[in-house]
Amino acid sequence: TAACAVIISQGASIQFVKLTTSLIYLIRPILLQIYVDRNYQIDKKIEYKEEPIKQKWNGVAQHVAAVVLDGTDTIVLTVFSSLSNVSIYSVYHLVIYGVKQLFTSMTNGIQSLMGELWARQELDELRDFFGWVEWSIHTGAVLVFSCTGALVVSFIGIYTNCVTDANYIQPLFAVLLVLANAVHCLRMPYNLMILAGGHYKQTQNNYIVAAIMNITVSIVLVKAAGLIGVAIGTLVAMLYQTVWMANY
């Protein structure tokens, strides 16, 4: 972020900015490789007798379902609606997704600490820590997304000023999309605990059902309600997943 800010302030082209970002991201795996080679003796020729990662395909299934869940709206709008709706959705998604990513980036490292406490079976400490994480994430999500919901339409109005290809002022759609992403963040403490505990197999059906639910509701409603339809589909899927995870 700092490098991009400096380069942009110097008037560099977008191509150079993206090249700089790519090179910075490339440095991390190289440094990790150097660190691992220096500090760990890994026998790459060893043969194992049983599957070392027992739930890896369950994890893959979860990840695929999560990708489908996140990408459903754009695909449904592209196939069943107009390109102007795709454009409107993309602008709102750019802003709201950025807010969500900024919020979720603050939780980096929490999962590993939960996993360590779970592995050591320090359950009292885990309960206390989880309670703090749950309160912090829920309070932060309510605060951040309340501000987002109040400001996003005005921001989009300024951002798309003089753009006449579509009507970008969509208050109801904005509220629904903000709610869907807020609910997605509300489920984070439960999702972090599930992943920290390694319960991939036990919870993969939840991800699959949520993805199917999002696709089905979005396709059914998109013809009649357009952007509102896909936003409702996403919100319904997120609500289902959050309630299920909290109960689990």
Question: At which residue positions do the language-model features occur?
Answer:
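Alpha-helical transmembrane segments of polytopic membrane transporters and translocases
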Residues: 20, 57-58, 73-74, 87-106, ...
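Hydrophobic alpha-helical transmembrane segments
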Residues: 1-37, 55, 209-213, 224-248
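Interhelical loop/hinge segments that connect adjacent transmembrane helices in multipass membrane
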Residues: 11-21, 27-71, 75, 109, ...
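Helix-loop junctions and terminal segments of transmembrane helices
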Residues: 96-134, 190-196
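Membrane-interface junctions at transmembrane-helix termini in multi-pass inner-membrane proteins
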Residues: 1, 12-15, 36, 40, ...
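Helix-terminus/linker motif at the lipid-water interface of multi-pass membrane proteins
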Residues: 10, 67-98, 116-117, 153-165
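Alpha-helical transmembrane segments of multi-pass membrane transport and lipid-handling proteins
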Residues: 6, 130-185, 215-224
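Interfacial/gating helices of multi-pass transporter permease domains
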Residues: 14, 51-55, 59, 77-97, ...
